Amino acid sequence: MSWFNRVKPSISSTAKRDVPEGLWWKCEECGAALHKKQMEASDHTCPQCGYHFRISPYKYFSLLFDNQKYVEFDDHLRAADPLHFVDTKKYPDRVSDTIEKSGKTEACRNAHGLCGGETLVISAMDFSFIGGSMGSVVGEKISRAVDKAIELQSPLLVISQSGGARMMEGAFSLMQMAKTAAKLSLLSEHRLPYISLMTDPTMGGITASFAMLGDINISEPKALIGFAGPRVIRDTIKRDLPEGFQRAEFLLEHGFIDRIIPRRELKSDLTTLLSLMKL
C-alpha cells in the first residue's frame, strides 16, 4: 500500500517580491496604473487623462523656482490651543500626531526665490496636514508672506489647497479670514501683484477670503472650488446641481476665475504673467 501513502509533489510557486511602497500610483480619474518615474516626469499628473494629483508645497517650490533654489521662512511657527479643544482627541495631540506621521509642521509653507528670473514669494498650502485647514498659524504665515513680498518688492503667489477653516480653533480660525484679506490690501497700496492659484480642493473660508482676492485668479484643471460642498448645497436647496458645478471649468465659464492652467504649463505661464506685470 506504499502508493497510498505517497505524497504528491506540491505545485511550485515563485516567491513574491516586495514592491516598495509608493512605487506605483493609481489614477483616481481613469484608473491607470502609473509608475513613480512617470509621475515625476509628468509633474504628478496622469499622462492618460490629465488628472492632477495633490502635491506638497515643496513640490510646487521645486516646480516653480528657478533651478529648484529657494529660501523658506517662518517655518518655526506652531499651533497653540487657546480653546483647549477636544473631539476624538485633544487638539495638541492631533497636531503632534500629524507632525509625526507627515513630517510636516503646518498646513502652509512660505518661500521666496526666482521664477523666470523674477523675484517671487510663494505661500503654499498642504491638504495632507489636517485637510489644509486654516488656523492661526496659516493666517499668520500668509500675512508674513505679504510682509516679505513688500520687503522684497516682489509679487506674491498663494497656492490654495484646503477644506476651509480649522474648527479646532473656533473663532480664532475665522478671524484669519479678515486678517488675511486686510493684509492683502497692503499689496495694492504698494502696487505689488497678487496671484491666487486654486488647486483641488479650495473650499470654505479659504474661498471666502484670500483665494478669490487675487489680481489674477487662476486654477488647476478640474479643481473643486467653492464655499459649502455640493452635497450640502443640494440637500439644502433640494435641487439637482448643474453638471460640473464648483469645478474650475464651471467657474471659468461663469467668470469667477481668469484662467485654468495645467500644472506642466504653470511655470512658463507664470513667468509670462510676472514679466507682463512688471511693465
Swiss-Prot record:
Keywords: ATP-binding, Cytoplasm, Fatty acid biosynthesis, Fatty acid metabolism, Lipid biosynthesis, Lipid metabolism, Metal-binding, Nucleotide-binding, Transferase, Zinc, Zinc-finger. Pathway: Lipid metabolism; malonyl-CoA biosynthesis; malonyl-CoA from acetyl-CoA: step 1/1. Pfam families: Carboxyl_trans (PF01039), Zn_ribbon_ACC (PF17848). Its EC number is 2.1.3.15. A zinc finger (C4-type) spans 27-49. Zn(2+) binds at C27, C30, C46, C49. The keyword tRNA processing does not apply. Residues 23-279 form the CoA carboxyltransferase N-terminal domain. Binds 1 zinc ion per subunit. It comes from the Bacteria. One of its GO terms (molecular function) is carboxyl- or carbamoyltransferase activity. Its cofactor is Zn(2+). Its main location: cytoplasm. It is found in: Cytoplasm. It catalyses: N(6)-carboxybiotinyl-L-lysyl-[protein] + acetyl-CoA = N(6)-biotinyl-L-lysyl-[protein] + malonyl-CoA. GO terms for biological process: fatty acid biosynthetic process; malonyl-CoA biosynthetic process. Signal peptide: none annotated. It is an enzyme of class 2 (transferase). PANTHER family: ACETYL-COENZYME A CARBOXYLASE CARBOXYL TRANSFERASE SUBUNIT BETA, CHLOROPLASTIC (PTHR42995:SF5). HAMAP family: AcetylCoA_CT_beta (MF_01395). Belongs to the AccD/PCCB family. Acetyl-CoA carboxylase is a heterohexamer composed of biotin carboxyl carrier protein (AccB), biotin carboxylase (AccC) and two subunits each of ACCase subunit alpha (AccA) and ACCase subunit beta (AccD). Component of the acetyl coenzyme A carboxylase (ACC) complex. Biotin carboxylase (BC) catalyzes the carboxylation of biotin on its carrier protein (BCCP) and then the CO(2) group is transferred by the transcarboxylase to acetyl-CoA to form malonyl-CoA. NCBIfam families: accD. This is Acetyl-coenzyme A carboxylase carboxyl transferase subunit beta. It comes from Chlorobium chlorochromatii (strain CaD3).
